[in-house]
Amino acid sequence: MTFLFSTLQLSLFSLALVIFGYIFLRKQLSRCEVDSSTIPEPLGALPLFGHLHLLRGKKLLCKKLAAMSQKHGPIFSLKLGFYRLVVASDPKTVKDCFTTNDLATATRPNIAFGRYVGYNNASLTLAPYGDYWRELRKIVTVHLFSNHSIEMLGHIRSSEVNTLIKHLYKGNGGTSIVKIDMLFEFLTFNIILRKMVGKRIGFGEVNSDEWRYKEALKHCEYLAVIPMIGDVIPWLGWLDFAKNSQMKRLFKELDSVNTKWLHEHLKKRSRNEKDQERTIMDLLLDILPEDIVISGHVRDVIVKATILALTLTGSDSTSITLTWAVSLLLNNPAALEAAQEEIDNSVGKGRWIEESDIQNLKYLQAIVKETHRLYPPAPLTGIREAREDCFVGGYRVEKGTRLLVNIWKLHRDPKIWPDPKTFKPERFMEDKSQCEKSNFEYIPFGSGRRSCPGVNLGLRVVHFVLARLLQGFELHKVSDEPLDMAEGPGLALPKINPVEVVVMPRLDPKLYSLL
């Protein structure tokens, strides 16, 4: 009897063990199924704040996110306050973002920078997706940055580049040392500002309205990437008091100058006066009726917000690209020599290179592409927000989730780019597929509806300035040490340290006198 009882106990225990094991296994499998549809994320999320503490420190955000990608994969998420941020950094996931889900993720979150500096989100780059953004984007792409419009303003580019060359020549043809990054800064600002409102400043000029505008824009470049508590935990926005005050002061400075320029244009129009150079502000005033109101934004606000957005995104990014390109060439003299040899063989030394010659300079184009690969104009895309539930990289992304692409990581992925940290323009000549944007391996200006509308203009300026500089001058470092290539914080990944260059004319003096 005892034996039977013990046997029954053992059988019941075994049955219970089997049932428990079955239930446990089902739960584990169910958990695995849930986890397989959940985007990976780092451990250590804090109550309320989530992963915000992981973004602290001096290390650049693009590099912090790249390190997380190495650990968690090409798509991962961070819990930031009340919101979830999805970060993508491989071609397949990026393609999902910018093709299949381009419309679903086309809007922008409502952030402090857009409210305080972007004319309450009237700026093209920060406006939410909707009727207003679509109408403004159409105006900008069709009327301001079409190939015809860019061609019509070619004389401005030529004039400003000539001014730079004459400044470098110094009139005596001797060797001189210049801070080339500062000269690029003034050059590109003048090109953009003349296109926008017909204004310019001299090299080194200070205290004018135009100079104040330029300096305020530089501060904006930095403030735009500073994390704000209120952007992820709205009811703690009061903690951003100091930063918000900075933004408001900057906006007051920018808007006062913008308003002055607008009034000057309106006054000339009322008198039927015409400037020699037709500006983008003129075009906007032609297109937009005086009484127009789109999504609560009146004409004057739309005009000023557009001028600010295009100047902010177009000036510094171009000068920074030129600075990186020259720095890379100085550290790689063989590439510099090859570029000059190509120019000499294609154009010669008897005339100045023109924009129409650039199409024949394949190595120069490769230098610009490689510069954009290593130092993209924006290392991170602007943050998007999902307008509806969608699937990205095989994972479900809920409405309201924020997304960005780490272009810096994408462009340095060793699975895509052999020896990714090395400056090698030849890679764009050896493998044509590397520069095909449709591959989503190389997207220096972003992609989709929210990509940079001024990409063609920016590329023209970079190629033309670099070609003229290399044609007209021998360039050398001031010492035998390699240039420090440390990047700083900002929208456009600026170079931290200035670049001093020894310049020496390499053409017939008569050519410089013709400019």
UniProtKB/Swiss-Prot annotation:
Deletion phenotype: No visible phenotype under normal growth conditions, but loss of TMTT production after alamethicin elicitation. Enhanced susceptibility to the fungus Alternaria brassicae. Increased oviposition rate of the phloem-feeding insect cabbage whitefly (Aleyrodes proletella).
Cofactor: heme
Name listed for the protein in its UniProt record: Dimethylnonatriene synthase
Function: Involved in the biosynthesis of homoterpenes, attractants of herbivores parasitoids and predators (e.g. predatory mites and parasitoid wasps). Catalyzes the conversion of the C20 (E,E)-geranyllinalool to C16-homoterpene 4,8,12-trimethyltrideca-1,3,7,11-tetraene (TMTT) of the C15 (E)-nerolidol to C11-homoterpene (E)-4,8-dimethyl-1,3,7-nonatriene (DMNT); these volatile compounds are produced upon insect herbivore attack and emitted from flowers and vegetative tissues during herbivore feeding. Required during resistance responses to the fungus Alternaria brassicae.
Gene Ontology MF term list: (3E)-4,8-dimethyl-1,3,7-nonatriene synthase activity; 4,8,12-trimethyltrideca-1,3,7,11-tetraene synthase activity; DMNT synthase activity; heme binding; iron ion binding
Organism of origin: Arabidopsis thaliana
GO biological process, alphabetically ordered: defense response to fungus; defense response to insect; negative regulation of egg-laying behavior; response to bacterium; terpene biosynthetic process; terpenoid biosynthetic process
Top-rank EC class of the record's enzyme: oxidoreductase
Conditions for induction: By wounding, upon insect feeding, by the fungal elicitor alamethicin and infection with the bacterial pathogen Pseudomonas syringae DC3000. Induced by the biosynthetic intermediate 8-hydroxy-7-keto-d-cadinene (C234), especially in synergy with the bacterial pathogen P.syringae pv. maculicola (Psm).
Positions bound to substrate: H219
E.C. number(s) listed in UniProt: 1.14.14.59, 1.14.14.58
One Pfam family this sequence matches: p450
Cross-link Glycyl lysine isopeptide (Lys-Gly) (interchain with G-Cter in ubiquitin) per UniProt, renumbered positions: K252
Tissue expression: Expressed in stems, flower peduncles, receptacle of developing and mature flowers and in stigma of mature opening flower buds.
Record-level GO cellular component terms: membrane
Biochemical pathway: Secondary metabolite biosynthesis; terpenoid biosynthesis
Topology class, membrane: Single-pass membrane protein
Top-level taxonomic group: Eukaryota
Reactions accelerated catalytically: (3S,6E)-nerolidol + reduced [NADPH--hemoprotein reductase] + O2 = (3E)-4,8-dimethylnona-1,3,7-triene + but-3-en-2-one + oxidized [NADPH--hemoprotein reductase] + 2 H2O + H(+); (6E,10E)-geranyllinalool + reduced [NADPH--hemoprotein reductase] + O2 = (3E,7E)-4,8,12-trimethyltrideca 1,3,7,11-tetraene + but-3-en-2-one + oxidized [NADPH--hemoprotein reductase] + 2 H2O + H(+)
